UniProtKB/Swiss-Prot annotation:
Belongs to the peptidase S33 family. It comes from Lactobacillus delbrueckii subsp. bulgaricus. Its EC number is 3.4.11.5. It catalyses: Release of N-terminal proline from a peptide. This is Proline iminopeptidase. It is found in: Cell envelope.
Amino acid sequence: MMQITEKYLPFGNWQTYCRIVGEATDRAPLLLLHGGPGSSHNYFEVLDQVAEKSGRQVIMYDQLGCGNSSIPDDQAETAYTAQTWVKELENVREQLGLDQIHLLGQSWGGMLALIYLCDYQPEGVKSLILSSTLASAKLWSQELHRLIKYLPKGEQAAIKEAETTGNYDSLAYQAANAHFMDQHAIKLTPDLPEPVLRKKKGGSLAYLTGWGPNEYTPIGNLHGYEYTDRLKDLHLPALITSGTDDLCTPLVAKSMYDNLPNARWELFAGCGHMPFVQENAKYQELLSDWLISQD
């Protein structure tokens, strides 16, 4: 049985919950950044075996605003920003003494990784894994609106009405959005691993404040996120992973692949937003081999 260590790291007046898989080795740990904002580390537990397979610690944490970390919803406008989440990431590295890391960001976590690398130029990041993520909020929204056109006409109309009026409470909209997310994120069925189905704590206000009411209407404080042209300056090895049916469409993934000087892209057939869940064994093997090759 692998060793699991749980810690609460002080972060200003708050605390960050951290979960460490395995014992320290001479290989750089893998640090995981979850999506959302506000999704919590839970689903990353399906990658625990990567610690053993690749001979290193795998470290995950709940970002401020969700999970077992502090949830300062009363300070949402100042707490739930890219700047604060980057400071938290820096604090996690500092508190745990993570001089050398491999960094994996899934969905919003990939945005956080790119903001961190482009704007803060940190040292000691050996490689980057961009899991179903994006370099442009605008392209992401455009692509998802293209996918919405494949929904039944009534569902398209419900989504359009919600976006036009700003009222996302109607049952018709909620049903349409749920259908869209079943198709392109992941359909939650009882046979999925427990960490994926586990009810997450908090996170909804972090999501609304940072991103917006849904995946395709980025009206939160990250709405201007645009890093496509900055990718050319990132020379570290980068592995992009995505699914054919992903919210991260092949065009979104290709826009990152084309602009990163040292990138590899693995496209998972038949997968949505979580190939690491839907093709777990294949994903673990890919990730472990990548980490070993980049040590």
